[in-house]
Amino acid sequence: MLLRMALCLTVSTILCAGFASNLMDILRRPVNQVWDMFEESHLPAGIGLDAWSKAKEMATAMTSLGASQRALFLRQVSPSQADLTEAALVLRGAQPLPEDRKQVFIREGSPSTAVRDLAEALYSKGAVLADGTGRGALKMMSAFQPGEAFMLTIKLSLYAGVVISFPLLLYFLLQFIIPGLLEHERKLLYKCMAVGFGLFLAGTLFCYFIVLPRVLTFFYTYSLEFGISNEWRIGYYLSFATQMILMFGLAFELPVVVMPFVKLGVLTYDMMKSTRRYAIVAIAVLAAVITPTPDVATMMLMAVPMYALYEICIILAWMHERKEAARTREEIARFEEDFNNNNSPYNQ
C-alpha cells in the first residue's frame, strides 16, 4: 500500500515538474490580482487599468524627447490616450512639489482643459504613478540561496502532484480496509471517494479564485497603512498559498466524513439537528484557525461554506432516514401479504 502511494506520488510529481513554469504562473495570478484591484481602486470612473498603464509607459518614454518629437509621438495614438498620457506627465511633474503647490501646478501646467480635468481627477483618487501595472512592487521572484529556485520547483510539483493524484492516493490508502467490507459497504466507500474528490477540488478552486486574493489584499493594504513595503519572497508565498489552498480542500471534505456515519446509523437526523449549535461553534473555531487573517469577512468565507455543507448533511440524513423507513414499511407490508396468503414458513 505505502509503496503504491509513494510510486503514484512520485510519478505525479515528475509529471507536474514538466509544467512547473505554468504552475508558477497559475499560483502568481492571485498576487497580480491584488495589485490590479489596488490600482483600479485608485482610478476615476471611465479610466481603465490598461489605458492608464499604457499612458504611464508612454509618459516615461516621452521624458527624453523634445517638444516637436513629443507632439509627433502623441499623434500616433488616439486623442483620449494622448490626453491621458499628458495627464500622467503633469502628475509626475507635480510629484516632488509640496502638497499645497501640487494642485496649482496641475491647474496651471496642463496644456489643455481636457488634460487638466483628467489630471485633477487622477490626483483626487490618488492614482499610482509607477510604470506599467506596478506589479513589480511585489518582488515575488527574489531567491536568497543558490538552490532555492530548484527546491521551490520540487515543492510546487509535489503539492500539485498531491492534488492531481488525490483519488488514487485515497484509493490505495483505503485498500487496507476494503477487503473486510461487505458489498454494500464497498459501494458506499467508492461513492464517498468520488464525492470526496469533487468536494476537495471545489474547496481548492473556491480558495484560489475567491479567498486567496482577498487574503492577499488584506495583508497588502495592511502593510501599506503602516508604511511597510510589500517585498514578498517567492518561497514564503508559495508555502502560504499552497497550504491555504490544501486546507480549504480538506475542509470541504466535511460531508465525506459525516455521511458514512449516517449510513451506518452512528449519526441520525435528530442528533445532527439537535447539536447544530455546537456544530456552528466548532466550524467557527476551525475557520478562525485555518484562515490566516483576523478579519471576520475572511473567516466567514471559510465558515459559511462549511456550515452550508453541514446543513446539506442534515438534509441528506433526513432523506436517508425517510428512504430507510419507506423500505422497512415495504418489507413489513410484503411480509404481511405473504403471511396472509399462507406463503409464510410459519403457516406450514
Swiss-Prot record:
Regions that span the bilayer: 7-27, 162-182, 192-212, 244-264, 278-298, 299-319
One Gene Ontology MF term: proton motive force dependent protein transmembrane transporter activity
Superkingdom of source: Bacteria
GO-annotated cellular components: TAT protein transport complex
Signal peptide: none
Keywords: Cell membrane, Membrane, Protein transport, Translocation, Transmembrane, Transmembrane helix, Transport
One GO biological process term: protein transport by the Tat complex
UniProt-annotated location(s): Cell membrane
Membrane topology, as annotated: Multi-pass membrane protein
UniProt similarity note: Belongs to the TatC family.
Function: Part of the twin-arginine translocation (Tat) system that transports large folded proteins containing a characteristic twin-arginine motif in their signal peptide across membranes.
PANTHER family assigned to the protein according to its UniProt record, in alphabetical order: SEC-INDEPENDENT PROTEIN TRANSLOCASE PROTEIN TATC, SEC-INDEPENDENT PROTEIN TRANSLOCASE PROTEIN TATC, CHLOROPLASTIC-RELATED
Subunit relationships: Forms a complex with TatA.
UniProt name for this protein: Sec-independent protein translocase protein TatC
Protein's organism: Akkermansia muciniphila (strain ATCC BAA-835 / DSM 22959 / JCM 33894 / BCRC 81048 / CCUG 64013 / CIP 107961 / Muc)
Taxonomic lineage from the root: Bacteria, Pseudomonadati, Verrucomicrobiota, Verrucomicrobiia, Verrucomicrobiales
